[in-house]
Amino acid sequence: MLAEAGYAYSSSVAPVAHDHYGWRDAPRYAFRPLKDSPLVELPVTVARVAGRHIATGGGFFRMLPGALTDFAVRQVNAEGHAGIFYFHPWEVDPDQPRVANAPLRSKVRHYSRLGAMAGKLRGLIARHDWGRVDAVVAREAALLA
């Protein structure tokens, strides 16, 4: 459906085990989700530590040491791939409204370390080379051919 709509890629897969999202057994790097489709799936970057995949974007980036994401980006770059990083725009707004009656787990996930996020992002951007996703898709698609 995405390819039919003109999309060249998706980055919807997180190769991790998680209670709300994730596909534990997904490939860590680009793949074609449908055999005869031109669509390329670019899984978000995870750190591989002791045989496990650890998420490094979004709330995990916010709450875990930045060194983990740095490690993951260096790891995927060393294996010849680009880091695929994501965050949610609301994660750089420490003054966002709070949902008073939200469960504690949701509060921890959504509000922890919001004030640190912008600085962590600036540091991540400065420490690594980043590029345009169209170039990444073209390179990864060529590797899949």
Roles of regions detected by a PLM:
Residues 1-86:
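Active-site-adjacent pocket scaffolds in enzyme catalytic domains
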Residues 63-145:
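C-terminal domain-boundary segment and adjacent tail
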